[in-house]
Each structure stands twice: as structure tokens, then as C-alpha cells.
Curated annotation (Swiss-Prot):
It comes from Caenorhabditis elegans. The gene is nhr-10. Signal peptide: none annotated. Disulfide bonds: none annotated. GO terms for molecular function: nuclear receptor activity; RNA polymerase II cis-regulatory region sequence-specific DNA binding; zinc ion binding. It is found in: Nucleus. Residues 152-392 form the NR LBD domain. Belongs to the nuclear hormone receptor family. This is Nuclear hormone receptor family member nhr-10.
Amino acid sequence: MTGGGPSSNNSSQPEEVCLVCSDISTGYHYGVPSCNGCKTFFRRTIMKNQTFSCQFQGKCPVDKSIRCACRHCRFEKCLQVGMDRNAIQQNRDPIGYTKRTRRYPPIKKVEASDECSPAMVSENDRSEDNFLTLLSSTEQKCCALRLAEYMPSRTLIEAVVSDCLLTDEVFMAEHAILSPRHRVTSLRFANQSDYHYWHERDWFVMIEWAKTLPVFQSLPFTDKLALLRHSAITYPSLVHVFNSPDHGLDTIVFPDGAYFDRTPEPTRPLGFNKKKYQMLDQLLKPMRSMEIDMTEFAAFKAIFFLNPDADDVDSNAKKTLSDGRSAITNALYRYMVKKKGAEDAGDRFGRLLLLGTVLATMAVEMKEAVLVADFFDQIQFSTFAKQLLFGIKTE
């Protein structure tokens, strides 16, 4: 430690964090250290005698990046950490900003007088908002590359270390052209070759998309592989659902007209049949109901991808991923406030982020199904797919 004086003494004191969401605490509110956002949320809930319900058995995560997602779980967390409802009185502790009583390192304020309201626009906010716009435009490029004829034959290592194709304007102008194969002229029931074809294409695009994310590019190679492996099952599912033409809530259509619905497929492993029912019921229906736009989809996809808790991600990369994810989450919420207004934005924001719980559950179940299918040779995975799903074997 360098230097002396007051700053030395201050730096030796551990920062107190909000026991509810782990943001920086602004002091003790209702008996526990908490931030202004959680203090305000708890007070409003008690004063208005509000009750909430949870769509996911009360098991939603509550942290500073997604604390607005599920109000039921957030309120339960307030009670669990010891917030005292009896400490709230009508004329005491009015809702508003509480001056910090200790000097903390400068942080970006993400809460204002209302729960999860966007802070005043700062340079940081503008940077985050600009990146959200970039994510949306990149998503359009992903769609173009997905529908093109171009499909390289390469190993996973070659795919990850090569230059990003989506940012190569010359390449995109020459190759990102709609393939005649990907024009829907009629519908036909998908077979195993169709599933294989579209998963391989979506994995190819996923890697090129990941390379447009500065956070991903800053990671060591092993952490990049861990993130790609973590999303190898869920990324195609999201893309299939979002880009499917509307043929009802029981049908998902690939760009070439192949489709699947609730029709049982006895030739496919049991776990894969379960996955398609999950996609229809837990992804397609809510996403169609919300009418998610390109920007919201692009942000949600990135938030789920940049998971600091993904298997095999090194501890040194977790903060980088968490910060990158939080920046996108902040920008997404501000975007929703502008689009829907503050009153509806919180509910929409929460409903979208809670789809991450669906994806996480799907990933765990499908990982086991994939291992079983490979062990019993129920599905013939390509070399590239095996490298992505099971890891790169070293001699």
C-alpha cells in the first residue's frame, strides 16, 4: 500500500455491501446494510401492502444486475437477510436518496428515487447504450450470415482464433447473401439431417458473434471455450425460436421450411423430444407474447452468454464477465423504459430475464441427454460438434 493520511485509513476499511443484491451499501436501512434501490423497494412493498408471485418456485437469483427481475424473490431476500418491516413508519425514512456516510470508490449510480429507475444519463450510460445499438446491428448481420451459403470446414480452435467474419465488410458483402436453399417454398417435417444442419450453422454463427464482444475477446482461450461450450445447447434454441416464421405456438420453422411441432419423434432420443416441448412452451410462447424486438433479443442473448458462473470459467475472468453483463443489463433496462415507459418496463425486464432460468434448466437437462446420446451412438455428432460439446481432446 502506498501513501498515508486519510485515504490509507479509508482503504483499510472493508466496503459494506447490500445484503440483498450485493451492490454498495449506502448505510443501514431497516436493520441491515442495503443500497437505496433495495431500501426503496422494501419500503414501497410494505407501505403499499403489495404481494408478488414467482414463476419459478421462488428460486430466482437476486443480485445487482438482475435485482428487478423477480419482485417476489427480491422481497423474500429482503426478509431473509433481516429487514424489519416493523421499522417502517409513515413519516420516517422517506423514500429518496440517502447521503453516503462513508467514502467509497466512485461507482456508477444505477438506482434513483424509484426502484430500478434509470439514473441520469452519464458518459458511462451513453457508452452502454451505444453498445446495445451495436449489438442490435450485429444481430442483423448474424441473420444474414446464417442464411448465406457460406459454411467453412474448420476445427473449433481454428474457428475461435480466426479473424471475425461479421466485422469484415468485404467478406460480408461477398458472402452474406441469401442462399436459394434457405428460401421457404413449402413446409416439411424436419428430419435428423435438418437438425444437424441448422445446429452446425448456428454454432458457426455463434462463434463469429462471440468474437464481436470485447469482453469475450479479452478472455484467455480456455475461458472462451468454456463460454462457447456453456451456450452450445441454448444458443441454437434461442435463435430457432426468435427467427421462426409464425405458424402458431406449436410449430418452429427453420429457414429452409423444415419444421418441428408436438408430433412425437420416436427415432430421436427422449431428452431431445423433451427439449422441443420446452422450446415451444417455455420459450416460444412467452417470447411471442412479449413481442420481443431485435434489440431486446440481442441483449438477452449476450446477457445469458456472458455467464460468470459457466462451468470451467476461471475465477480471474468472473469479474470481467460480470461487469460486461451488467453493462448490457443496464442499457437494456433503459431501452425498455424508453420503449414502454417506467411503469411497464420493470415487468417486461423481469419477464425477459427470467427466461434465463428456463435456458439454464434446459442446458443442464440437455447436457445429460447429449452425453447419453453420444455414448449409445444415438446421434452421429460431427468432429466439430464433439469438440464444442465435450471439449477438445489433447493427445
